Amino acid sequence: MNLIAQLEAEQIAALGKDIPDFKAGDTVRVGYKVTEGTRTRVQMYEGVVISRKGGGIGASFTVRKISFGEGVERVFPLYSTNIDSITVVRRGRVRRAKLYYLRDRRGKSARIAEVSNYKPKADAKA
């Protein structure tokens, strides 16, 4: 392990975040801290993960949802201090790592089949 990877691993461990195992196609609910004036509250954002990018401390993921008939995408840094929680709502069965084609789909063609027999990876934290 090189020095940069070691430093990133130490920073991730110092954050102490419990990140669930999720990938593109999964539906997640992200609790994001929003500051309004002096008050801070947690806003839930639920949608389909259409991509995960990067590795280490700079990793991010993109979540897409349909809000009032319009598609809305939001990019979240995975280890951001503003992320309160990440919950996997359902597991999707897809054959791509990036689901950008969902931007052009509407209705039934934009649906993702659910995985019924999901088993977490052996090396992932349970």
Swiss-Prot record:
GO molecular function, one term: structural constituent of ribosome
PROSITE patterns per record: RIBOSOMAL_L19
A cellular component annotation (GO) from this entry: cytosolic large ribosomal subunit
Keywords annotated in UniProt: Ribonucleoprotein, Ribosomal protein
Keyword Ribosomal protein listed: yes
Primary role: This protein is located at the 30S-50S ribosomal subunit interface and may play a role in the structure and function of the aminoacyl-tRNA binding site.
GO biological process: translation
Similarity section: Belongs to the bacterial ribosomal protein bL19 family.
PANTHER family with a match to the protein in the record: LARGE RIBOSOMAL SUBUNIT PROTEIN BL19M, RIBOSOMAL PROTEIN L19
Protein name per its UniProtKB record: Large ribosomal subunit protein bL19
InterPro entries per the UniProt record, alphabetical: Ribosomal_bL19 (IPR001857), Ribosomal_bL19_CS (IPR018257), Ribosomal_bL19_sf (IPR038657), Translation_prot_SH3-like_sf (IPR008991)
